[in-house]
């Protein structure tokens, strides 16, 4: 008799995706981040659901409802901080996942990669609207500054901003719709993640060497299920260390002050995971130019397959490209640091140089280096 998991219509899908899936035998821990992102998403949806039961999306009561969750709701504080720090873990996993894709040439799977870039944009949008909900000072001013960037769009900009605000400033209508967006977007992310997996399973996973591994496959279960569970335990450990010992480490103290439209904080800055893009935005003195640079800094990922000039897929055997990759990582860390600094000398010039280097590495240096490596190998 055939096993039920291979015949039942629903079980068959699960079986083909997580149990009998043929996987390369040599994929490293860098391949864990996909499943960790799935865990993060489930965790965020669950904690978010319980927070939504007590949260009120009204400008008068939003801040106090979050305070009420932390003080009066049973284990409300842990749910709130798991949700806030869970977002940080989500982005750490996202950056690792994208970095792995760049290093090992995963972007050659075009559909999977492009859906991934759309997912990245969607997660960033979700995190942004979510940050507005506690209605603290940084929530309010962050929403005002970032939505205002759309006014740089020629002709329709101002109308577009007022349409998003639902009025002439960030107010009750804005908060209510941002709560609605924040509630629906994670389910859209879940649907997109399924499409992401669907396209991935059409081609099968890449492996560190970049060489096809059709002749050397192993079943996903038990090998990679166990490996994923280990990753999950480490993720939960790190998250709970943050939540229980330093819940506000990654947050902004200004967000513990209720939103006040009459008082601007001295340094308006987003959460840490947006600082690299914020630094690129600020490094250009022109508003429209800054917005274009901001969008390009993420959208540039879509160009990766076009910029791949190497005859090898992975960077595993390409030492010069490896050096460039790690310089790019260091550059992104520098941008993250600059994004959190005030707009003054020497931070302005460092930010501008780091922004130029970011685009230079991806658009010029990496393709040129790959071509040089091809010639060195006499290919």
From Swiss-Prot:
Q: Which UniProt keywords apply?
A: Electron transport, Heme, Iron, Membrane, Metal-binding, Mitochondrion, Mitochondrion inner membrane, Respiratory chain, Transmembrane, Transmembrane helix, Transport, Ubiquinone
Cellular component GO terms, alphabetical: mitochondrial inner membrane; respiratory chain complex III
Compartments where located:
Mitochondrion inner membrane
Q: Which GO terms describe its molecular function?
A: metal ion binding; ubiquinol-cytochrome-c reductase activity
Domain of life according to the entry: Eukaryota
**Other notes:** Heme 1 (or BL or b562) is low-potential and absorbs at about 562 nm, and heme 2 (or BH or b566) is high-potential and absorbs at about 566 nm.
Among PANTHER family, the record links this protein to: CYTOCHROME B
Q: How does it assemble?
A: The cytochrome bc1 complex contains 11 subunits: 3 respiratory subunits (MT-CYB, CYC1 and UQCRFS1), 2 core proteins (UQCRC1 and UQCRC2) and 6 low-molecular weight proteins (UQCRH/QCR6, UQCRB/QCR7, UQCRQ/QCR8, UQCR10/QCR9, UQCR11/QCR10 and a cleavage product of UQCRFS1). This cytochrome bc1 complex then forms a dimer.
Q: Tell me the protein's name.
A: Cytochrome b
Write down the species: Elaphurus davidianus (Pere David's deer)
What taxonomic lineage is listed for the species of origin? Eukaryota, Metazoa, Chordata, Craniata, Vertebrata
Coding gene? MT-CYB
């Amino acid at each position: 008799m055939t096993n039920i998991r291979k015949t039942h219509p629903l079980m068959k899908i699960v079986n083909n995706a997580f149990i009998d899936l043929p996987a390369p035998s040599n994929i490293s821990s860098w391949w864990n981040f996909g499943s960790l992102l799935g865990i993060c998403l489930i965790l965020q949806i669950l904690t978010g659901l319980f927070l939504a039961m007590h949260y009120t999306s009204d400008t008068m009561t939003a801040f106090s409802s979050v305070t009420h969750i932390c003080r009066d709701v049973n284990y409300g504080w842990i749910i709130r901080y798991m949700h806030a720090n869970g977002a940080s873990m989500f982005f750490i996993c996202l950056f690792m996942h994208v970095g792995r894709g760049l290093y090992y040439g995963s972007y050659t799977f075009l559909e999977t990669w492009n859906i991934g870039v759309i997912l990245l944009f969607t997660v960033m949008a979700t995190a942004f609207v979510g940050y507005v909900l506690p209605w603290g000072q940084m929530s309010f001013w962050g929403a005002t500054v970032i939505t205002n960037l759309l006014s740089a769009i020629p002709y329709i900009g101002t109308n577009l901003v007022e349409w998003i605000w639902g009025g002439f400033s960030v107010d009750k209508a804005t908060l209510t719709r941002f709560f609605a967006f924040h509630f629906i977007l994670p389910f859209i992310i879940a649907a997109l993640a399924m499409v992401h997996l669907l396209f991935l399973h059409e081609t099968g996973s890449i492996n560190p060497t970049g060489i096809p591994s059709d002749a050397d496959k192993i079943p996903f279960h038990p090998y990679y299920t166990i490996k994923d569970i280990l990753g999950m335990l480490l993720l939960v450990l790190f998250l709970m260390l943050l939540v229980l010992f330093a819940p506000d480490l990654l947050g902004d103290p200004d967000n513990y002050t209720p939103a006040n439209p009459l008082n601007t904080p001295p340094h308006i800055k987003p959460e840490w995971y947006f600082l690299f893009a914020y630094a690129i935005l600020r490094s250009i003195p022109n508003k429209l130019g800054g917005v274009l640079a901001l969008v390009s800094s993420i959208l540039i990922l879509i160009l990766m397959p076009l910029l791949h000039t190497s005859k090898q897929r992975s960077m595993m055997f390409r030492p010069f490209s490896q050096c460039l990759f790690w310089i790019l990582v260091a550059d992104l860390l520098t941008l993250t640091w600059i994004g959190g600094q005030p707009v003054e000398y020497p931070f302005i010039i460092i930010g501008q140089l780091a922004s130029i280097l970011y685009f230079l590495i991806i658009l010029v240096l990496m393709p040129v280096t790959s071509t040089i490596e091809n010639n060195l190998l006499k290919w």
